[in-house]
Amino acid sequence: MNKWDKRFMELTCQVATWSSCFRAGRQIGAIIVKDNRILTTGYNGAPQGVESCRDKGECMRDKLGIPSGTRHELCYAVHAEQNAILQAARLGISLKGATLYCTHQPCVICAKMIINSGITRIVYKEGYPDEFSMQLLNQAGVQVDAYDNL
């Protein structure tokens, strides 16, 4: 592992603490980097102007008994990877050739956004039970590295 991967993953874990997700263990962070410079950050949380689950004091998914990794549409939060990509779009920043550092392996919805954004490498810390996302990323030529294997 090189010093930059270590530094950016440490920062990604710090960004995850900004999450407004109420669900235990679901604080996710993401940083998009190019040429060893941070372009954007993202964490999972409610869209701008929408009350977060943390502020409400409950998780809609827990209340409805929805297991992690399913029915993503039934959640107030925007995923960390999505927020980082959306910030780049909002600011007019190209992500072509960038690296995404994230605390968790991206889901299939995020994988599709990552592919189309031009990100060419992902470094993730925690695995996620979504083989389809990995298939898509591999097929699209996105390099995916588990942090512990670097």
Predicted regions and their residues:
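Zinc-dependent deaminase catalytic domain
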Residues: 1-150
